[in-house]
């Protein structure tokens, strides 16, 4: 395994094993893309959560072998450029369009800022029934340039609103061990509410969590919203995703919120994203928008 936290002698052993071919399978993060990571012969590259990688990053991985490797990319919501590539025949597609046995589709609701009292009542009911809750903020700290809710102030406020419950918080500026400790509390059920940023977008599996609240949801793209929603609905109980916004929304934002409330189908969401943002540049690195040759 190779991640950014693998250091010193252990890291050197991994790099040497890759270079001489004694390591057959490597599991890692973006750390695999670094220049000093060399493979004797890379035969297959599998990228999970493909939307988290840029075009240049993926190309850097392909370039680590003299002969191009076989490639498998996986994602719940293909980004516009990827969807366009499937349409033009550059990618073969396999689709898993069924939930695992026993799971129910997540019910997605849109609420406005002035409906927080009813939202808090719903959270209280879910936790009293033994369930757990995610509450996601777009910012860690207050930003004078953006009138958005932030995690640090929000966490303190939520502790006052829910004094009867235990809360954890995680964000990208925390030290890895501190973040792991807070996550462990939530995973093991020691805390009932996890206050977080988008660091929980991938790799979090808590079947007992039944509510995902996304504050200032207008600040998130369709892929992010769908990925965050995917943190709930992993058990047999009915789960809910609550998108909270203000009243003043652009037409594109309204369309994003509507498609999220209408479907749990990642491909329908990806198609809507393609229509809203454009396919990007199939010959370049732009992954959305309209590409023009001048």
Predicted region positions:
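C-terminal accessory region of SF2 helicases/translocases
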Residues: 236, 240, 248-294
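Inter-lobe coupling/hinge segments of SF2-like helicase ATPases
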Residues: 1-258, 268
